[in-house]
Design a protein with these regions (language model features):
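Short, small/polar-rich loop/turn modules that mediate ligand/substrate recognition or access, typified
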Residues: 17, 115, 120, 176-178
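Active-site loop-to-helix junction immediately N-terminal to the catalytic Tyr of the SDR YXXXK motif
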Residues: 38, 89-97, 109
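Catalytic Tyr-X3-Lys loop
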Residues: 20, 41-60, 75, 79, ...
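A conserved structural motif in NAD(P)-dependent oxidoreductases
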Residues: 150-161, 172
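Alpha-helical segment proximal to the catalytic Tyr-Lys
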Residues: 68, 112-113, 174
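Short C-terminal tail/terminal secondary-structure segment
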Residues: 88, 148, 166, 177-190
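Substrate-binding pocket helix/loop in short-chain dehydrogenase/reductase
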Residues: 5, 33-40, 44-49, 134-135, ...
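Active-site helix of classical SDR
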Residues: 63, 99, 107
């Protein structure tokens, strides 16, 4: 809800004095369970809409709410969390992957328009993460298979993704914007 987001931004600004970094990391009602995933023929537009609303509408509302402050400060950092599945849909999570792919376009447009104000915008796209609430149903065999197909011979951890987020939020990354950086152990090298 846009009003709730505006209140959240206002509360955070009052508490911290200003906001420097926004991380868009919404996941609405989704589990990475290939056995429960609907096939495309069984999906409804409402299934898509739920993921589009959580991912894109959520990022839109948060980003639009904080932009006036970022423009006034002449700085700000927007980091959105994506997925490597848009490059290699090993499991066709249609609605989730489509929403996250849209997040890349959203982010690149924000970067192009707002860079003139010192604002950076990037996406960090993780692979299968070991282990999160969303990947809790993933079998050990799948984790092993992914590990064996990556050059690093490991499954990405939440800490691996967090490390990239911390880098992009730092002053060392002020020259990085409009990028989708994939953190998946090299699984989707391109």
């Amino acid at each position: 809800d846009r009003n709730d987001v505006n209140r959240m931004i206002q509360t955070a600004t009052q508490h911290f004095g200003k906001i420097d970094i926004v991380i868009n990391n919404a996941l609405v009602g989704f589990k990475f369970d290939p056995n429960q995933q609907k096939s495309f023929k069984d999906l409804t537009w409402e299934d898509y809409q739920q993921q589009l609303n959580g991912t894109l509408k959520g990022a839109f509302n948060v980003t639009q709410s904080v932009i006036p402050q970022f423009i006034e400060q002449q700085s700000g950092c927007i980091i959105s969390i994506g997925t490597n599945l848009y490059q290699n849909p090993v499991v066709p999570y249609h609605e989730y992957t489509t929403a996250k792919a849209g997040l890349i376009g959203f982010t690149r447009n924000i970067a192009a328009e707002l860079g003139q104000y010192g604002i950076t915008a990037n996406v960090v796209s993780g692979g299968l993460l070991k282990t999160t609430d969303a990947s809790a149903v993933t079998t050990p065999e799948v984790f092993d298979l992914i590990a064996q197909t990556t050059p690093l011979r490991k499954v990405t951890s939440p800490q691996d993704v967090a490390n990239m987020v911390v880098y992009l939020a730092s002053d060392e990354a002020r020259g990085v914007t409009g990028q989708n950086i994939t953190v998946d152990g090299g699984l989707t090298m391109n």
